[in-house]
């Protein structure tokens, strides 16, 4: 979109293989040090590139935003940087601090408890299980990595046993599968949260904000994922006034500027609960098309109607997108799980692949090399494929 709007696009990436590497929409790609593992060298190289190529706007696209935010003082001397402060980003990224903030603003969120150690986990777990079902996850995580979902109380572990006996069997199974992480994985510096499980439909958002005002927004259905609770691979724009109002109030109250996303659960009776915040670009960006106005929202949000919030840029009604390869993988869940193959086929038909572009096909072939590279890294470091894809850029609260 940026290139089609007449802008020159330069990409700085720490991974050797990435989708933009061969794209005809990119003027030039640069390989930079890992933001996570070589933060100072990364920021030095970014500053050099910004100066050398006279970059006017720097747009972080994933968790490198947290490292860029730590270098805004030096980078901001040379170009506009589309980030908020590192202090604000940290608060929103931290899964417990975000919940506390949203609750203080009077916005609906699930009951969420902070767990700082294995001992706290062991003490809290039996008490919480008496109250209901809980989701356990690290406060610093992304794409549902390491999330532990509760085992359904209706799963038939004990065959024809009574409901009461079957429920007890479930809880025993849940305890066996939900032992505390190792001491290295959970600590005061890297705690977990236990969040009350809310049954309902998952809805996600992507917004561009400027000084507390939304200038671009989409709410989207993300019903197909990698695994049962993994990263989204299918995105469909939906109009949802309740979600938009929740996001608008939050952005206004915090004065946020930059790209931001939220994950919501909507219950059967229409109650909305925000469960996480992603203070960065999310997959909802794929739902915008050239001409929708997103480029203007990113580059010049302070102009006229956008600044006054008289017009919020949104995707066209019915806009859909998917990541084709992992979407194909999700069909197995429909065949062997609880999904509907017919619904999956309906979703597939007429949905564009975000990687494939008829006039720019090289990124489509490059994705196989990207996956292979991530698979090798995953094997080497004993990571999931999703974790391997963000291994060099993820941020877990570290400060320079």
Q: Where are each of the predicted segments found?
A:
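Glycine-rich phosphate/pyrophosphate-binding beta-alpha loops
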Residues: 143-144, 223-234, 278-291
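Glycine-/Pro-rich loop/turn segments that contact NAD(P) or position catalytic residues
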Residues: 79, 87-112, 122-127
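Phosphate-binding site of ATP-dependent enzymes
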Residues: 152, 158-229, 236-245, 266-273
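Hydrophobic anchor at the start of a short beta-strand
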Residues: 8-10, 109, 192
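Conserved metal-phosphate-binding beta-hairpin within the catalytic cores
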Residues: 252-287
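ATP-grasp fold ATP-binding core
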Residues: 102, 126-147, 186-200, 217-221
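ATP-binding N-terminal substructure of ATP-dependent carboxylate-amine bond-forming enzymes
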Residues: 1-84, 119
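Peripheral (often C-terminal) accessory segments that flank ATP-dependent C-N-forming ligase machineries
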Residues: 296-400
């Amino acid at each position: 979109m940026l290139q089609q709007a007449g802008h020159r696009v330069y990409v700085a990436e720490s991974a050797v293989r990435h989708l933009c590497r061969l794209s005809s929409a990119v003027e030039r790609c640069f390989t930079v040090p890992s933001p996570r593992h070589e933060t100072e060298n990364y920021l030095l190289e970014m500053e050099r590139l910004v100066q050398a190529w006279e970059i006017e706007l720097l747009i972080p696209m994933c968790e490198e935003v947290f490292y860029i935010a730590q270098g805004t003082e030096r980078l901001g001397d040379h170009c506009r940087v589309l980030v908020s402060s590192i202090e604000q980003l940290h608060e929103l990224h931290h899964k417990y601090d975000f919940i506390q903030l949203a609750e203080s603003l009077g916005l609906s969120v699930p009951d969420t408890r902070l767990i700082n150690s294995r001992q706290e986990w062991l003490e809290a777990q039996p008490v919480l299980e008496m109250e209901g079902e809980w989701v356990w996850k690290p406060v610093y995580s992304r794409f549902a990595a390491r999330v532990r979902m509760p085992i359904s109380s209706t799963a038939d572990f004990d065959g024809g046993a009574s409901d009461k006996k079957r429920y007890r069997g479930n809880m025993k199974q849940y305890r066996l599968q939900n032992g505390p992480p190792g001491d290295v994985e959970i600590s005061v510096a890297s705690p977990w949260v236990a969040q009350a499980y809310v049954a309902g439909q998952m809805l996600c958002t992507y917004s561009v904000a400027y000084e507390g005002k939304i200038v671009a927004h989409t709410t989207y259905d993300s019903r197909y994922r990698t695994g049962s609770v993994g990263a989204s691979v299918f995105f469909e724009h939906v109009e949802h006034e309740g979600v938009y109002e929740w996001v608008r109030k939050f952005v206004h109250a915090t004065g946020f500027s930059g790209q931001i996303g939220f994950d919501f659960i909507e219950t059967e009776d229409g109650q909305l609960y925000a469960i996480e915040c992603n203070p960065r670009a999310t997959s909802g960006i794929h739902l915008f098309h050239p001409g929708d106005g997103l480029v203007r929202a990113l580059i010049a949000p302070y102009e006229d109607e956008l600044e006054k919030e008289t017009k919020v840029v949104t995707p066209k009604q019915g806009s859909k997108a998917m990541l084709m390869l992992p979407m194909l993988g999700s069909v197995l869940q429909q065949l062997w799980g609880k999904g509907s193959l017919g619904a999956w086929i309906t979703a597939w038909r007429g949905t564009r692949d975000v990687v494939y572009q008829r006039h720019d096909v090289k990124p489509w072939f490059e994705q196989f090399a990207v996956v292979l590279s991530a698979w090798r890294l995953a094997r080497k470091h004993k990571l999931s494929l999703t974790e391997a894809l963000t291994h060099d850029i993820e941020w877990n609260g570290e400060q320079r």
